[in-house]
Curated annotation (Swiss-Prot):
It comes from Pseudescherichia vulneris (Escherichia vulneris). GO terms for molecular function: glucosyltransferase activity; UDP-glycosyltransferase activity. GO terms for biological process: carotenoid biosynthetic process. Keywords: Carotenoid biosynthesis, Glycosyltransferase, Transferase. Pfam families: Glyco_tran_28_C, UDPGT. This is Zeaxanthin glucosyltransferase. Disulfide bonds: none annotated. InterPro entries: Glyco_trans_28_C, UDP-glycosyltransferase, UDP_glucos_trans, UDP_glycos_trans_CS. It comes from the Bacteria. It catalyses: all-trans-zeaxanthin + 2 UDP-alpha-D-glucose = zeaxanthin bis(beta-D-glucoside) + 2 UDP + 2 H(+). Catalyzes the glycosylation reaction which converts zeaxanthin to zeaxanthin bis(beta-D-glucoside). The reaction proceeds in two steps with the monoglucoside as an intermediate. Gene3D superfamilies: Glycogen Phosphorylase B (3.40.50.2000). It is an enzyme of class 2 (transferase). CDD domains: GT1_Gtf-like.
Amino acid sequence: MSHFAIVAPPLYSHAVALHALALEMAQRGHRVTFLTGNVASLAEQETERVAFYPLPASVQQAQRNVQQQSNGNLLRLIAAMSSLTDVLCQQLPAILQRLAVDALIVDEMEPAGSLVAEALGLPFISIACALPVNREPGLPLPVMPFHYAEDKRALRRFQVSERIYDALMYPHGQTILRHAQRFGLPERRRLDECLSPLAQISQSVPALDFPRRALPNCFHYVGALRYQPPPQVERSPRSTPRIFASLGTLQGHRLRLFQKIARACASVGAEVTIAHCDGLTPAQADSLYACGATEVVSFVDQPRYVAEANLVITHGGLNTVLDALAAATPVLAVPLSFDQPAVAARLVYNGLGRRVSRFARQQTLADEIAQLLGDETLHQRLATARQQLNDAGGTPRAATLIEQAIAGSESVS
């Protein structure tokens, strides 16, 4: 059996997905050690085979800086990401040698893992907990809000936005380049240039992507990384629609947006449960009842609530969207940051939901909610997407692909 280290950014949703994968690997007899922050609640679940390594103070501070900038200025966030990659590239070699790991499981959003693995001659697997970073001519980057199109104007827009993105990411690219040179590796500057040649595993499925024509043979859609299967809930007919609303763990502080959502749901005669993920004070949470909310909570059993709902209103985080697709529940996306605008664009393209600006008026939001609740044409497309998720294999297939890649030390197609 092998000892794996997991390297990932300090983002809770990524840690949850990777923790599910770690538990699956442990069940198969492997050892897994997390080298990431922001997993306090997960660390409480430490077992004999799933451990959380105490990181040096410099790494912890760099991870806190990324967390603090996740809702702030984009340039400061990029600077924080660059600093984290820098300190990880300095600290990881000694840590990995001390742990005597056999291979790495690396989140695509933290290139330090792949750089250090390659420098040490260790096999590594890339995991896309968000939208995959693989680039393709004719497709917008997975952080851009653009819809799929093939006309010249759209292609030009994709190209220009790619150049702008690369310019903004220049500090991070220079950090990647500097450490690649220091380790004696071929030059690289971008996340997609740091992907594993053995296996690239995505939480997504084709039903939640734009048409792909140039993915490598080692790329695999496996669907949601979950340790427990999605709940099997029969959505009983209701005279009053039930809506579940969440803006994720990083955006749960947006009181005014929650208030607008509550009022919009009430105006169309729907019940709404709002999960703010500890982002609101008790007084702020209570204020949502006066706006029409039926239930306001910090955290819930999200897969079950999503499965029982007639509609999910979300920031467009991939984990929440995958929960909705697993339950064949339509989605209204209100994208806020990161890859959420891109997830929303893919939802709309595949006919699985709609998107609305966070700046939209209450009436506009209510109109979108009413349209989705009354759209019977959604159900077949949602059923197809759910079946695709079920067939993709999920966490067990991801674990099998990792085992195959490590056993043969060659690309798994």
